[in-house]
Protein backbone atom coordinates (compact mmCIF):
# COMPACT_ATOMS: atom_id res chain seq x y z
CA UNK A 1 0.00 0.00 0.00
CA UNK A 2 1.10 3.56 -0.67
CA UNK A 3 2.34 5.95 1.95
CA UNK A 4 -0.34 7.70 4.01
CA UNK A 5 -0.15 11.46 3.49
CA UNK A 6 -3.31 12.82 5.14
CA UNK A 7 -5.38 11.63 8.10
CA UNK A 8 -8.71 13.26 8.97
CA UNK A 9 -10.21 13.23 12.47
CA UNK A 10 -13.90 14.13 12.70
CA UNK A 11 -15.71 14.71 15.97
CA UNK A 12 -19.21 15.91 16.72
CA UNK A 13 -20.82 14.18 13.75
CA UNK A 14 -23.60 13.94 16.31
CA UNK A 15 -23.73 17.26 18.12
CA UNK A 16 -24.48 15.90 21.60
CA UNK A 17 -21.59 13.41 21.57
CA UNK A 18 -19.14 15.62 23.39
CA UNK A 19 -16.10 13.34 23.64
CA UNK A 20 -15.24 13.58 19.95
CA UNK A 21 -16.37 17.18 19.58
CA UNK A 22 -14.17 18.43 22.41
CA UNK A 23 -11.22 16.33 21.29
CA UNK A 24 -11.44 18.04 17.90
CA UNK A 25 -11.59 21.39 19.68
CA UNK A 26 -8.51 20.47 21.69
CA UNK A 27 -6.63 19.35 18.57
CA UNK A 28 -7.56 22.60 16.84
CA UNK A 29 -6.28 24.56 19.83
CA UNK A 30 -3.10 22.47 20.18
CA UNK A 31 -2.45 21.12 16.65
CA UNK A 32 1.10 20.07 17.48
CA UNK A 33 -0.15 17.07 19.49
CA UNK A 34 -1.51 15.33 16.38
CA UNK A 35 1.13 16.28 13.82
CA UNK A 36 3.67 13.73 12.64
CA UNK A 37 6.75 14.11 10.40
CA UNK A 38 5.51 11.93 7.54
CA UNK A 39 1.83 12.93 7.21
CA UNK A 40 -0.66 15.72 7.81
CA UNK A 41 -3.57 15.42 10.26
CA UNK A 42 -6.62 17.61 9.75
CA UNK A 43 -9.63 18.00 12.02
CA UNK A 44 -13.31 18.68 11.35
CA UNK A 45 -16.16 19.48 13.72
CA UNK A 46 -18.86 17.45 12.01
CA UNK A 47 -22.11 19.17 12.96
CA UNK A 48 -21.37 22.63 14.42
CA UNK A 49 -24.99 23.78 14.68
CA UNK A 50 -26.09 20.62 16.46
CA UNK A 51 -23.09 20.90 18.78
CA UNK A 52 -24.03 24.48 19.67
CA UNK A 53 -27.62 23.37 20.31
CA UNK A 54 -26.54 20.31 22.31
CA UNK A 55 -28.61 18.08 20.01
CA UNK A 56 -27.80 14.96 18.01
CA UNK A 57 -28.82 16.74 14.80
CA UNK A 58 -30.80 19.74 13.57
CA UNK A 59 -33.03 18.23 10.87
CA UNK A 60 -31.77 14.70 10.24
CA UNK A 61 -28.98 12.35 11.28
CA UNK A 62 -25.79 13.61 9.61
CA UNK A 63 -24.27 10.14 9.81
CA UNK A 64 -26.95 8.88 7.41
CA UNK A 65 -26.37 11.56 4.74
CA UNK A 66 -23.32 10.23 2.88
CA UNK A 67 -24.90 8.03 0.25
CA UNK A 68 -23.30 8.91 -3.10
CA UNK A 69 -26.69 9.60 -4.66
CA UNK A 70 -27.56 11.95 -1.80
CA UNK A 71 -24.29 13.85 -2.06
CA UNK A 72 -24.94 14.36 -5.77
CA UNK A 73 -28.59 15.37 -5.35
CA UNK A 74 -28.96 19.19 -5.51
CA UNK A 75 -32.56 18.96 -4.29
CA UNK A 76 -31.57 17.74 -0.82
CA UNK A 77 -31.28 20.97 1.13
CA UNK A 78 -31.59 20.15 4.84
CA UNK A 79 -28.82 21.52 7.06
CA UNK A 80 -27.30 18.05 7.45
CA UNK A 81 -27.47 17.31 3.71
CA UNK A 82 -25.62 20.55 3.00
CA UNK A 83 -23.10 19.81 5.75
CA UNK A 84 -22.52 16.29 4.37
CA UNK A 85 -21.69 17.76 0.97
CA UNK A 86 -19.26 20.21 2.61
CA UNK A 87 -17.52 17.40 4.51
CA UNK A 88 -17.34 15.23 1.38
CA UNK A 89 -15.80 18.21 -0.41
CA UNK A 90 -12.95 18.16 2.11
CA UNK A 91 -12.53 14.41 2.47
CA UNK A 92 -13.42 13.35 -1.05
CA UNK A 93 -15.31 10.14 -1.75
CA UNK A 94 -14.12 6.55 -1.90
CA UNK A 95 -13.42 6.63 -5.65
CA UNK A 96 -11.77 10.08 -5.42
CA UNK A 97 -10.35 10.44 -1.90
CA UNK A 98 -8.67 13.64 -0.76
CA UNK A 99 -7.39 12.03 2.45
CA UNK A 100 -5.98 8.58 3.12
CA UNK A 101 -7.53 7.71 6.50
CA UNK A 102 -10.79 8.91 8.12
CA UNK A 103 -11.34 8.57 11.88
CA UNK A 104 -14.90 9.39 12.94
CA UNK A 105 -15.25 9.89 16.72
CA UNK A 106 -18.48 8.90 18.45
CA UNK A 107 -19.74 8.26 21.97
CA UNK A 108 -22.64 6.17 23.19
CA UNK A 109 -24.85 5.71 26.23
CA UNK A 110 -24.21 1.96 25.88
CA UNK A 111 -21.31 0.34 27.70
CA UNK A 112 -19.16 -0.08 24.58
CA UNK A 113 -15.87 0.77 26.28
CA UNK A 114 -13.30 1.51 23.59
CA UNK A 115 -14.63 0.14 20.31
CA UNK A 116 -13.43 0.32 16.72
CA UNK A 117 -16.13 -0.11 14.06
CA UNK A 118 -15.04 -1.16 10.58
CA UNK A 119 -17.04 -1.16 7.38
CA UNK A 120 -14.62 -3.42 5.49
CA UNK A 121 -11.73 -5.78 6.13
CA UNK A 122 -8.94 -3.89 4.42
CA UNK A 123 -5.61 -5.46 5.48
CA UNK A 124 -4.31 -2.11 6.75
CA UNK A 125 -7.33 -1.71 9.05
CA UNK A 126 -7.17 -5.31 10.29
CA UNK A 127 -3.48 -5.00 11.17
CA UNK A 128 -4.08 -1.64 12.85
CA UNK A 129 -6.91 -3.10 14.92
CA UNK A 130 -4.89 -6.19 15.82
CA UNK A 131 -2.14 -3.89 17.06
CA UNK A 132 -4.53 -1.71 19.06
CA UNK A 133 -6.27 -4.66 20.70
CA UNK A 134 -2.96 -6.38 21.44
CA UNK A 135 -1.48 -3.44 23.33
CA UNK A 136 -4.83 -2.64 24.98
CA UNK A 137 -7.10 -5.66 25.54
CA UNK A 138 -9.97 -3.28 26.37
CA UNK A 139 -10.20 -2.33 22.68
CA UNK A 140 -12.96 -4.26 20.91
CA UNK A 141 -13.34 -4.43 17.12
CA UNK A 142 -16.71 -4.59 15.36
CA UNK A 143 -17.34 -5.25 11.70
CA UNK A 144 -20.45 -4.40 9.71
CA UNK A 145 -21.33 -5.72 6.27
CA UNK A 146 -19.26 -4.23 3.41
CA UNK A 147 -20.47 -0.70 2.92
CA UNK A 148 -20.51 -0.17 -0.81
CA UNK A 149 -23.29 2.36 -1.12
CA UNK A 150 -23.34 3.11 2.62
CA UNK A 151 -24.68 6.37 4.04
CA UNK A 152 -22.21 6.54 6.95
CA UNK A 153 -19.50 9.22 7.02
CA UNK A 154 -16.79 6.57 7.38
CA UNK A 155 -17.83 5.07 4.03
CA UNK A 156 -16.36 8.10 2.23
CA UNK A 157 -12.96 6.43 2.49
CA UNK A 158 -11.74 2.85 2.14
CA UNK A 159 -9.69 3.40 5.29
CA UNK A 160 -12.51 5.06 7.20
CA UNK A 161 -13.52 3.75 10.62
CA UNK A 162 -15.31 4.79 13.80
CA UNK A 163 -14.03 5.05 17.35
CA UNK A 164 -17.06 4.50 19.58
CA UNK A 165 -16.70 5.02 23.35
CA UNK A 166 -19.08 4.65 26.26
CA UNK A 167 -20.97 4.55 28.44
CA UNK A 168 -21.44 8.29 28.70
CA UNK A 169 -24.62 10.36 28.72
CA UNK A 170 -25.50 12.57 25.79
CA UNK A 171 -24.27 16.14 26.17
CA UNK A 172 -21.80 15.17 28.91
CA UNK A 173 -18.00 15.16 29.07
CA UNK A 174 -16.45 12.24 30.95
CA UNK A 175 -12.79 12.93 31.69
CA UNK A 176 -11.75 9.27 31.90
CA UNK A 177 -13.31 8.37 28.55
CA UNK A 178 -11.98 11.60 27.03
CA UNK A 179 -8.43 10.69 28.04
CA UNK A 180 -8.74 7.05 26.95
CA UNK A 181 -10.07 8.12 23.56
CA UNK A 182 -7.34 10.72 23.22
CA UNK A 183 -4.64 8.15 23.99
CA UNK A 184 -6.16 5.73 21.49
CA UNK A 185 -5.96 8.41 18.79
CA UNK A 186 -2.32 9.11 19.61
CA UNK A 187 -1.58 5.38 19.37
CA UNK A 188 -3.25 5.23 15.95
CA UNK A 189 -1.25 8.22 14.71
CA UNK A 190 1.96 6.65 16.03
CA UNK A 191 1.11 3.46 14.15
CA UNK A 192 0.57 5.39 10.91
CA UNK A 193 3.94 7.08 11.35
CA UNK A 194 5.64 3.71 11.86
CA UNK A 195 3.79 2.34 8.84
CA UNK A 196 5.09 5.18 6.66
CA UNK A 197 8.61 4.48 7.89
CA UNK A 198 8.27 0.78 7.04
CA UNK A 199 8.60 -0.07 10.71
CA UNK A 200 5.25 -1.66 11.55
CA UNK A 201 5.31 -3.32 14.99
CA UNK A 202 5.20 -7.11 14.97
CA UNK A 203 1.82 -8.40 16.10
CA UNK A 204 -0.09 -11.62 16.52
CA UNK A 205 -1.89 -12.25 13.24
CA UNK A 206 -5.09 -13.15 15.08
CA UNK A 207 -7.92 -10.71 15.66
CA UNK A 208 -11.18 -11.15 17.55
CA UNK A 209 -13.90 -9.54 15.49
CA UNK A 210 -17.53 -8.94 16.42
CA UNK A 211 -19.48 -9.21 13.17
CA UNK A 212 -22.85 -7.47 12.96
CA UNK A 213 -25.70 -9.90 12.25
CA UNK A 214 -28.87 -7.92 12.96
CA UNK A 215 -30.91 -5.77 15.33
CA UNK A 216 -33.89 -6.23 17.62
CA UNK A 217 -36.51 -3.67 18.62
CA UNK A 218 -38.22 -3.32 21.97
CA UNK A 219 -41.48 -5.24 22.34
CA UNK A 220 -44.31 -2.91 21.34
CA UNK A 221 -48.10 -2.92 21.30
CA UNK A 222 -50.33 -2.27 18.30
CA UNK A 223 -49.90 1.48 18.71
CA UNK A 224 -46.12 1.19 18.59
CA UNK A 225 -45.68 1.92 22.30
CA UNK A 226 -42.78 0.21 24.07
CA UNK A 227 -44.00 -2.54 26.39
CA UNK A 228 -40.69 -3.77 27.84
CA UNK A 229 -37.22 -2.56 28.73
CA UNK A 230 -33.75 -4.09 28.69
CA UNK A 231 -33.54 -6.86 31.27
CA UNK A 232 -31.25 -5.96 34.21
CA UNK A 233 -29.17 -9.11 33.60
CA UNK A 234 -27.84 -7.73 30.30
CA UNK A 235 -27.89 -3.96 30.91
CA UNK A 236 -24.34 -2.55 30.53
CA UNK A 237 -23.07 -6.00 29.44
CA UNK A 238 -22.17 -5.16 25.86
CA UNK A 239 -20.02 -7.87 24.22
CA UNK A 240 -21.09 -10.49 26.79
CA UNK A 241 -22.50 -13.72 25.31
CA UNK A 242 -26.28 -14.03 25.15
CA UNK A 243 -27.50 -17.62 25.05
CA UNK A 244 -30.84 -18.88 23.75
CA UNK A 245 -33.30 -18.70 26.63
CA UNK A 246 -31.42 -15.98 28.52
CA UNK A 247 -33.56 -13.04 29.73
CA UNK A 248 -33.56 -10.23 27.17
CA UNK A 249 -36.37 -7.83 28.09
CA UNK A 250 -38.45 -7.08 31.19
CA UNK A 251 -42.07 -6.09 30.64
CA UNK A 252 -43.55 -3.11 32.41
CA UNK A 253 -45.39 -5.49 34.74
CA UNK A 254 -42.20 -7.36 35.62
CA UNK A 255 -42.21 -10.43 33.37
CA UNK A 256 -39.00 -11.60 31.69
CA UNK A 257 -38.90 -12.11 27.92
CA UNK A 258 -36.23 -14.58 26.81
CA UNK A 259 -33.92 -14.41 23.82
CA UNK A 260 -35.47 -16.75 21.26
CA UNK A 261 -32.52 -17.13 18.91
CA UNK A 262 -30.93 -20.48 18.14
CA UNK A 263 -27.28 -19.53 18.63
CA UNK A 264 -25.11 -17.47 20.95
CA UNK A 265 -24.89 -13.79 20.06
CA UNK A 266 -22.92 -10.89 21.51
CA UNK A 267 -25.14 -7.81 21.90
CA UNK A 268 -23.68 -4.32 21.47
CA UNK A 269 -25.16 -0.83 21.70
CA UNK A 270 -27.50 -2.16 24.39
CA UNK A 271 -30.11 0.47 25.30
CA UNK A 272 -28.43 3.21 23.24
CA UNK A 273 -30.53 6.33 23.84
CA UNK A 274 -30.25 7.59 20.25
CA UNK A 275 -31.57 4.30 18.87
CA UNK A 276 -35.01 4.52 20.48
CA UNK A 277 -36.17 6.64 17.53
CA UNK A 278 -34.70 4.08 15.13
CA UNK A 279 -36.54 1.14 16.69
CA UNK A 280 -33.36 -0.58 17.89
CA UNK A 281 -32.94 -2.00 21.40
CA UNK A 282 -29.52 -3.47 20.61
CA UNK A 283 -27.40 -4.88 17.81
CA UNK A 284 -26.49 -8.55 17.62
CA UNK A 285 -23.01 -9.71 16.63
CA UNK A 286 -21.24 -13.02 16.30
CA UNK A 287 -17.69 -13.39 17.56
CA UNK A 288 -15.11 -14.47 15.01
CA UNK A 289 -11.40 -15.11 15.22
CA UNK A 290 -9.70 -14.22 11.97
CA UNK A 291 -6.17 -15.07 10.91
CA UNK A 292 -4.34 -12.85 8.45
CA UNK A 293 -0.79 -12.57 7.18
UniProtKB/Swiss-Prot annotation:
It comes from Trichormus variabilis (strain ATCC 29413 / PCC 7937) (Anabaena variabilis). Binds 1 zinc ion per subunit. Transmembrane segments: none annotated. GO terms for cellular component: cytosol. It comes from the Bacteria. Pfam families: AstE_AspA_cat (PF24827), AstE_AspA_hybrid (PF04952). Keywords: Hydrolase, Metal-binding, Zinc. This is Probable aspartoacylase. GO terms for molecular function: aspartoacylase activity; hydrolase activity, acting on ester bonds; zinc ion binding. Its cofactor is Zn(2+). Coiled coil: none annotated. Belongs to the AspA/AstE family. Aspartoacylase subfamily. InterPro entries: AspA/AstE_fam (IPR050178), Aspartoacylase (IPR016708), AstE_AspA_cat (IPR055438), Aste_AspA_hybrid_dom (IPR007036). Substrate binds at residues 56, 63-64, 164, 275. It is an enzyme of class 3 (hydrolase). It catalyses: an N-acyl-L-aspartate + H2O = a carboxylate + L-aspartate. Zn(2+) binds at residues 14, 17, 106. Its EC number is 3.5.1.15.
